[in-house]
């Protein structure tokens, strides 16, 4: 049986996969995202940046899979960033930065880019690879100062790309989206299905055998 391994510490990505009938192993990648982005240079296309980061995250965990004694594995790596005013924004990391970002994006729209990489691993070796990105337009509301400060105080927007979530508290401040909602959460199911097919895996082969209803 093929085992899916999620190369991410994101609880949101894990929740999306579990809700879709998959029970992945989780192995957290330790790649230096800033270094990879810097090596690509300032002129790199935003879509390339998130895709290369997803590829690096997926590849980084492969050597450690040998200890799991798995013979047939697909590794999924993802990276999300918000593209606004021509600039890519990852996790703000601080309240001040998150506040400034919300001041710039409130009442406007931006594009959430998510790079995806799927690796087929057999006997510890990468035998097939497929990668691509998704792009979803997010239309933001204009939260009141009180609501925004309360949101910032929760700490949620500090640790997510673009300083917002769709599936949690941040969803109150998203007017609508154009595109795949799961990709905004961090892992696009339609795109992952396509990439799995490219490496020779049917998504139904990854579903849990027991009923999920």
Curated annotation (Swiss-Prot):
The keyword Hydrolase applies. GO terms for biological process: nucleotide metabolic process. Its EC number is 3.6.1.9. Transmembrane segments: none annotated. One of its GO terms (cellular component) is cytoplasm. It catalyses: a ribonucleoside 5'-triphosphate + H2O = a ribonucleoside 5'-phosphate + diphosphate + H(+); a 2'-deoxyribonucleoside 5'-triphosphate + H2O = a 2'-deoxyribonucleoside 5'-phosphate + diphosphate + H(+). It comes from the Bacteria. Pfam families: Maf (PF02545). One of its GO terms (molecular function) is nucleoside triphosphate diphosphatase activity. Keywords: Cytoplasm, Hydrolase, Nucleotide metabolism. The active site is at 79 (proton acceptor). Its cofactor is a divalent metal cation. Nucleoside triphosphate pyrophosphatase. May have a dual role in cell division arrest and in preventing the incorporation of modified nucleotides into cellular nucleic acids. HAMAP family: Maf. Belongs to the Maf family. This is Nucleoside triphosphate pyrophosphatase. It comes from Rhodococcus erythropolis (strain PR4 / NBRC 100887).
């Amino acid at each position: 049986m093929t085992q899916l391994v999620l190369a991410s510490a994101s609880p949101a990505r894990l929740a999306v996969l579990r809700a879709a009938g998959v029970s992945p192993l989780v192995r957290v990648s330790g790649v230096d995202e800033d270094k990879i982005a810097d090596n690509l240079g300032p002129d790199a296309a935003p879509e390339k940046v998130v895709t290369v980061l997803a590829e690096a995250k997926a590849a980084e965990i492969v050597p450690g899979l040998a200890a799991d004694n798995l013979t047939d594995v697909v590794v999924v790596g993802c990276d999300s960033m918000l593209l606004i005013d021509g600039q890519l924004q990852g996790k703000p990391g601080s309240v001040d930065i998150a506040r400034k970002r919300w001041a710039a994006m409130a009442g406007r729209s931006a594009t959430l880019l998510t790079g995806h990489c799927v690796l087929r691993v057999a006997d510890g070796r990468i035998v097939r690879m497929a990668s691509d990105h998704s792009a979803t337009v997010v239309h933001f509301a204009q939260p009141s100062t009180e609501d925004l400060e309360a949101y910032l105080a929760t700490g949620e927007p500090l640790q997510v790309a673009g300083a917002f979530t769709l599936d949690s508290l941040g969803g109150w401040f998203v007017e609508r989206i154009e595109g795949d909602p799961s990709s905004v959460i961090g892992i696009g199911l339609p795109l992952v299905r396509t990439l799995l097919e490219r490496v020779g895996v049917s998504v139904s082969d990854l579903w849990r055998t027991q009923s999920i209803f």
